[in-house]
Amino acid sequence: MIKVFVMPTCPDCTKVMAQVKDNPEYQIIDIGAHVRNLKEFLYLRDNDPVFDAAKRYGFAGIPCFVLEDGTVTLSSLEAGISPARNGASCRIDGSGC
């Protein structure tokens, strides 16, 4: 099962959530729903180099995908999901929302 870390207020996340809804191959984890989920995501974000560019440019790093082999990626394509069309994107400073 592929874990998908999201927040419903993130435009990119809502597109991914709509694509994987009711698909048993994906587990949606809302990082805003419980502190346990947030801690799990922050551990990944703090320790996996896949987030380096996202952090450098002020992005949160969601949606984030943890593949069945443990690989962490920010690419929906690598997780078997069609890439979202360009649209709104939120940065940590609130711009782009």
Where are these regions (language model features)?
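Thiol-based oxidoreductase modules, predominantly thioredoxin-like and allied folds used
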Residues: 25-48
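Local sequence-structure signature of Cys/Sec-based thiol-disulfide redox active-site neighborhoods
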Residues: 1-31
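C-terminal cap of thioredoxin/glutaredoxin-like
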Residues: 70-90, 94-96
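Thiol/disulfide oxidoreductase modules built on the thioredoxin-like
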Residues: 54-61
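Short, glycine/charged-enriched secondary-structure capping and boundary segments
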Residues: 18-20, 43, 79-80
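A short, hydrophobic beta-strand/beta-hairpin element that forms part of a small beta-sheet core
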Residues: 61-73
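Residue-level detector of bioactive/disordered segments in secreted/extracellular proteins
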Residues: 12-15, 66, 92
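Short glycine-/acidic-enriched loop or helix-start segments at secondary-structure transitions
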Residues: 14-16, 38, 74-77
